UniProtKB/Swiss-Prot annotation:
It catalyses: (2R)-3-phosphoglycerate + ATP = (2R)-3-phospho-glyceroyl phosphate + ADP. This is Phosphoglycerate kinase. The lineage of its organism: Bacteria, Bacillati, Bacillota, Bacilli, Bacillales. The keyword Cell division does not apply. It is found in: Cytoplasm. InterPro entries: Phosphoglycerate_kinase (IPR001576), Phosphoglycerate_kinase_CS (IPR015911), Phosphoglycerate_kinase_N (IPR015824), Phosphoglycerate_kinase_sf (IPR036043). ATP binds at K201, E323, G350, G351, D352, S353. Its EC number is 2.7.2.3. It holds the Pfam family PGK. Keywords: ATP-binding, Cytoplasm, Glycolysis, Kinase, Nucleotide-binding, Phosphoprotein, Transferase.
Length: 394
């Protein structure tokens, strides 16, 4: 990575505007999953230990440019204080007189959490005036919010035009891991692409077909490929307008010498619920009024063998409706195979796949779990991320 990192600056006595991703799930004012807060700790601790005055900025939810009381960041400051072992003050502004006063009262090594940046209408519009207002609070900008790096917003991209900047440790790690995987992968290199819709994964499949040795398909999007091969899919998810594209992808795989794996058997149900009637059928035998909600046992065995023989695996999207216990088996099989494969470097592309390995208690067995669903997806599509492009070059 040719962007400046934390080691390129002397932070002693400097005020740092550090963009983090504290967009955490909350219930009744309590944080239900603090993975993203934990992920930002190394950068926050380093800046504080180096004697910087640390201003943390993040979004939370979608307040659409106005103040929403339930989306204030105060509960995050409380939890952060416990994790850092020192008081983190929450300010009810992200810029302005109150924020300025709080910044001026901060000691070297002190940490301050600014208010939700999306309370300001200019944030998502990348308004230069708002970006300048953020920049006026600090000497250096650090972006550690990989989860928001694909957004060109005032606190992720705009501010970088007005301050010297650097990637934080988390941002650096994400870019290194994903960058290495896509530019210089260990082989065999396998991509596992699941999830509901083909349309969400078009760019990823297209880009990865130029790079991988094996492509494994699962989840709802698989049935458009199954149908494209001439099988009936009953009431399974199907995108009629993507059938030609599915055929093109399968042809491209053949031309590129990529092995293309699709379900050979599935678990079908007569209703989308945990207590529906369900049965295992071959891919050629999906009944007209039933829908496929998971990959079957034969498919799982095939996929497991491919994964265990791979040196690098990128996984994005579940194999079935893992939120329902009855249809979690396929996703669990992939997660278990990666957990057991000691010679395989596994990269979990955020979002649902990350939630699944977390749910199965296998998160610590994965080599790298990306903190950015949308950002890692766009990176895997080969797109440049605005929040990264804007950072200072070495």
């Amino acid at each position: 990575m040719n962007k400046k990192t934390l080691y390129d600056y002397d932070f002693a006595g400097k005020t740092v505007f550090c963009r983090v991703d504290f967009n955490v799930p909350m219930k009744d004012g309590k944080i239900t999953d603090e993975t993203r807060i934990q992920a930002a700790l190394p950068t926050i601790k380093y800046l504080s230990e180096q004697g910087a005055r640390v201003l943390l900025a993040s979004h939370l939810g979608r307040p659409k440019g106005e103040v929403v009381e339930s989306l204030r960041l105060a509960p995050v400051a409380t939890r952060l204080s416990e994790l850092l072992g020192k008081e983190v003050q929450a300010v009810q502004e992200a810029h302005g007189p109150v924020a300025k006063q709080a910044v001026e009262g901060l000691e070297d090594g002190g940490v301050l959490l600014l208010e939700n940046v999306r309370f300001y209408p200019g944030e998502e519009k990348n308004d230069p005036e708002l970006a300048k207002a953020f920049a006026s609070l600090a000497d250096i900008f650090v972006n550690d919010a990989f989860g928001a790096a694909h957004r060109a917003h005032a606190s992720t991209e705009g501010i970088a035009h007005y301050l010297p900047s650097a990637a934080g440790f988390l941002m650096e790690k994400e870019l290194d891991v994903l960058g290495k995987a896509l530019s210089n992968p260990e082989r065999p290199f396998t991509a596992v692409i699941g999830g509901a819709k083909v349309k969400d994964k078009i760019g990823v499949i297209d880009n990865l077909l130029d790079k991988v040795d094996n492509l494994i398909i699962g989840g709802g999007l698989a049935y458009t490929f199954v149908k494209a091969q001439g099988y009936e899919v009953g009431k399974s998810l199907l995108e009629e307008d993507k059938l030609d594209l599915a055929k093109q992808f399968m042809e491209k795989a053949e031309q590129k010498g990529v092995k293309f794996y699709m379900p050979e058997d599935v678990i079908v149900a007569d209703d989308f619920s945990d207590d529906a009637n369900k049965k295992e059928v071959a891919i050629s035998g999906i009944p007209a009024d039933w829908e496929a909600l998971d990959i079957g046992p034969k498919t799982r065995k095939t996929y497991e063998a491919v994964l265990k023989a791979s040196k690098l695996v990128i996984w994005n999207g579940p194999m079935g409706v893992f939120e329902l216990e009855s249809f979690a088996g396929g996703t669990k099989a992939v997660a278990n195979a990666l957990a057991e494969a000691s010679d395989t470097y596994s990269v979990i592309g955020g979002g649902d796949s990350a939630a699944a390995v977390e749910q199965f208690g296998l998160a610590d067995k994965m080599s790298h779990i990306s903190t950015g669903g949308g950002a890692s997806l766009e990176f895997m599509e080969g797109k440049e991320l605005p929040g990264v492009v804007a950072l200072s070059e070495k």
